[in-house]
Amino acid sequence: MAELATIARPYAEALFRVAEGGDISAWSTLVQELAQVAQLPEVLSVASSPKVSRTQVAELLLAALKSPLASGAQAKNFVQMLVDNHRIALLPEIAEQFEALKNAREGAADVQIVSAFPLEGAQLAELVTSLERKFKRKLKPAVEVDSSLIGGVRVTVGDEVLDTSVRARLAGMQAALTA
């Protein structure tokens, strides 16, 4: 995984520099779409086929996109460069790094919230507000329900984890009692 991140970083940074000259959100949508298309087994099969030219592969990728940027010269050049350098499989990692650059620019971060029970709108808003104060940045929440937590929440922001779940507390008590 580390080598994928290392290889993908220059592509993500170059695309981000291009995006800074326009609409970063639109470019983010484009790269997310590309990442989804690039993960399809059929696309990977066609891309690796010696019977299909690199230009045809690039056209196939661009044709599968809904983003209006897909018809632009910069998007075409980016996709063609990835195809020519056999880097289509890197698109999910490129998209992830692009999103991280976008979040850094906006002073924001993605947050994964895992809760034992579904969170209502007001509960989620209150939780996100308190987490934004704690982490001192704007958070973009993705919520998941995991009943094995028993109660509470587990919050992941980047490489920081805040686990206030009942399961984590019980595990801590068990470790203290058996030590």
Curated annotation (Swiss-Prot):
F(1)F(0) ATP synthase produces ATP from ADP in the presence of a proton or sodium gradient. F-type ATPases consist of two structural domains, F(1) containing the extramembraneous catalytic core and F(0) containing the membrane proton channel, linked together by a central stalk and a peripheral stalk. During catalysis, ATP synthesis in the catalytic domain of F(1) is coupled via a rotary mechanism of the central stalk subunits to proton translocation. F-type ATPases have 2 components, F(1) - the catalytic core - and F(0) - the membrane proton channel. F(1) has five subunits: alpha(3), beta(3), gamma(1), delta(1), epsilon(1). F(0) has three main subunits: a(1), b(2) and c(10-14). The alpha and beta chains form an alternating ring which encloses part of the gamma chain. F(1) is attached to F(0) by a central stalk formed by the gamma and epsilon chains, while a peripheral stalk is formed by the delta and b chains. It is a peripheral membrane protein. GO terms for cellular component: plasma membrane; proton-transporting ATP synthase complex. Keywords: ATP synthesis, Cell inner membrane, Cell membrane, CF(1), Hydrogen ion transport, Ion transport, Membrane, Transport. This is ATP synthase subunit delta. HAMAP family: ATP_synth_delta_bact. The lineage of its organism: Bacteria, Pseudomonadati, Pseudomonadota, Betaproteobacteria, Burkholderiales. Gene3D superfamilies: N-terminal domain of the delta subunit of the F1F0-ATP synthase. It holds the Pfam family OSCP. It is found in: Cell inner membrane. GO terms for molecular function: proton-transporting ATP synthase activity, rotational mechanism. Belongs to the ATPase delta chain family.
